[in-house]
Amino acid sequence: MRHQIQHLLAPLPGTARQIDSFHFGPEGGGKIYIQASLHADELPGMLLAWHLKQRLGELEKQDRLRSEIVLVPVANPIGLAQVLMDVPLGRYELESGHNFNRYFADLGEEVGNRVEERLNDDPRHNLRLIRDTLRVALAQQIASTQLQSQRLTLQLLACDADIVLDLHCDYEAVAHLYTTPEAWAQIEPLARYIGAEASLLASDSGGQSF
């Protein structure tokens, strides 16, 4: 297991927050990215991530992982610290009022313009080119707030993954998942495995969510 720490922009002197990511399995093959509790008051995702971390460590020791798996158990340390009179307030940032799962950097058009003249008939070349270009474009973004630095950190960790899982929960709901129509063929087996009673497909859910 490889433990990486990404420091966030500090909003005030004497304060510091970070994103911890745990990397399992071989690099250079496929990549799966899993994060939990982007809405920091949705705690079951963190519990699941803790158990998953133990299990992935066991599988790595047994050399049974075929792809890299990146696990971020606490995707929102900012929201996790927002507690008022023992009530967690981790869905919206108190300073800006922004939903923590909104306003991620939308660089699709910019990346498209950068790669347009360099695409060819090789899908692997195109995939590698688009991911590399996206990574560079994200790294060139300059965060001016801690929330912006948190968003960019998460996007940089996930931008080159083959599969991205963002774990949420609700106070009262059946098991369900969101994905895109393009990814449905890959995600449908997972939906069946977790017993999802509803699967919502949309190319763009709006709000620049993760």
Where are the language model's segments positioned?
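Structured catalytic-domain cores with a bias toward divalent-metal coordination
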Residues: 1-210
